[in-house]
Amino acid sequence: MNIEQLKERQKRIRNFSIIAHIDHGKSTLADRILEFTGTIDKRIMKEQILDSMDLERERGITIKLNAVEINYKSKDGKNYIMHLIDTPGHVDFSYEVSRSLAACEGAILIIDAAQGIQAQTLANVYLAVDNNLTLIPVLNKVDLPSADVPKVKEEIKETLGLDPEQALIASGKTGLGVIDILEQIVTRISPPQGDIQKPLQALIFDSYFDSYKGVVPSIRIVNGTVKKGDQIRFMASNSVYEVVEVGVYNPKQIVKDFLAPGDVGYLTAAIKSINHVRVGDTITSQTNQALLPLPGYKQMNSVVFCGLYPVETNKYDILKEALEKLKLNDSSLIFEPESSNALGLGFRTGFLGLLHMEIIQERISREFGVEVIATAPSVIYHVYSIKGEKLLVDNPSKLPSTQMIDRIEEPFIKATIMCPEIYIGKVMELSQNKRGALQNIEYIDSQRVMINYLLPFSEIIYSYFDKLKSLTKGYASFDYEIDKYRVSKLQKMDILLNGEIVDALSLIVHHDFAYERGKAICETLKEFIPKQMFEIPIQAALGKKIIARQTIKAMRKDVTAKLYGGDVTRKKKLLEKQKKGKKKMKTLGKVQLPQKAFLAILATK
């Protein structure tokens, strides 16, 4: 192809992503688009075709983003090349959404015609607006008996500020509206900007490890071209490689001769080092280098931390390798080695949220065969010492002694909760119990409200979302953004078994909630720790002060059973001997903490 032909081809490229609240039918609609355009043969079609992980299909959610090239002949008679970049809908994976949007010019915003606008819909709209994307609203699931199109169109106008007349109606189940969506993509989303004659600039928006091809980055070409044999340089890591292969996803890999501006695909270059490929980095040509990297997506910081330890201690190295490989296409995952007296060697690991933490643990177990124990999740605290120093603490065991601390600040979040009006009282009660401060209540319509709360992040990382769902019978939706740090009355609480501190059970608690939290943990441990030959005290302590205690009674052996008749002093002598033996056992005895006790404690909050 000559330059003019390539420029003409570029005018017929459309890059778009599909964004939606979790469970609004995004993956199903993507399936219908792929089926209608003939991208996927009906014989090999399976539900959620772009959700390549088994875990995604089982849970019915999208975790990783996926890109696929679609060829579509429009009503104007021209053939268009479309790149659909599928995105997750859960709040924890908004970084995946931001990566997708950095590679697009437009987005299809899917809204469930029965449920209406949800909290995450709102968050995704703001992300799209920040990226200057053209938004095409689509009302999905209009075939449901409970669908209320006029009401949802009114919500689009009032809550999102978009023109409701431009909203399309569709059904991912029946395929209704797919042609309208494709035609709107052609007419409303602009072709990609980019100059074929400028030095190569390609944005890495994802990557994964292939045991034969090495590290494979997914890229969006902004300027220039790339083909087999080119010398390329990764601008952040400054590493140079020779391109072995370029191609696109369909959704399996299809090798191409070259990739030009607007193309979304992949390249391989026998990259063996995981650290050389960073998501958000720019690839340029080694011989004709771009001066500046592309303004990439924003780097997301981990906000929830926990210790991950292998159940079988000899699998430490496999766990390390698993985390390194998962980090490759999940740039927000961070980890560093740590050790615990109770659990041995493991890693302090950072995540974007609780679902993210759960998914990573499950992937380690499924893909690498390593069962892990996770300690209680915590957030990053700002600790100011009496000398004026500021410490960042994500692990309770790193907290200095109380005498050395001037004040502790914890992160707060701005929470947006949408729910039916009848559940306002329950939502407010739950949020107040989690130390929340009400900011605003706004009626979306006569039945639904939007409630804004300021909440400590440490309070929602346990079971806030689960409780919210059960209190509102599943009707509430929840989204949050990190706000600033605020001073709180926080203290470190230690759990002692037989007088010894168990470091893996230490946690940072609010002073007002310390007693009930300590009492709950002691009761849980009493239930799950098996009896020993000696008595085991379980204590919760704030500094030197014990605030809660439970005792596991000793197993009793009847040492007087062999006596018959005779002197009572003989009986007393044997009981005294047993008492001394138990006292000695107690000083020497170690209490083993079973894994199920750890898991039960995580569920107590």
Swiss-Prot record:
What are the GO cellular component annotations?
plasma membrane
Q: Which GO terms describe its molecular function?
A: GTP binding; GTPase activity; ribosome binding; translation elongation factor activity
Q: Which InterPro entries match?
A: EF-4 (IPR006297), EFG_III/V (IPR035647), EFG_V-like (IPR000640), EFTu-like_2 (IPR004161), G_TR_CS (IPR031157), LepA_C_sf (IPR038363), LepA_CTD (IPR013842), LepA_IV (IPR035654)
Subcellular locations according to the entry? Cell membrane
- Please cite one Gene Ontology biological process associated with this protein: positive regulation of translation
Known EC number: 3.6.5.n1
Q: Coiled-coil annotation: which residues?
A: none
State the reactions this protein catalyses: GTP + H2O = GDP + phosphate + H(+)
Binding-site list for GTP: 23-28, 140-143
| Keyword field contains Cell membrane | yes
Q: Return the broad EC class.
A: hydrolase
Q: Which family does it belong to?
A: Belongs to the TRAFAC class translation factor GTPase superfamily. Classic translation factor GTPase family. LepA subfamily.
Function according to Swiss-Prot or TrEMBL:
Required for accurate and efficient protein synthesis under certain stress conditions. May act as a fidelity factor of the translation reaction, by catalyzing a one-codon backward translocation of tRNAs on improperly translocated ribosomes. Back-translocation proceeds from a post-translocation (POST) complex to a pre-translocation (PRE) complex, thus giving elongation factor G a second chance to translocate the tRNAs correctly. Binds to ribosomes in a GTP-dependent manner.
UniProt name for this protein: Elongation factor 4
The protein's gene is named lepA
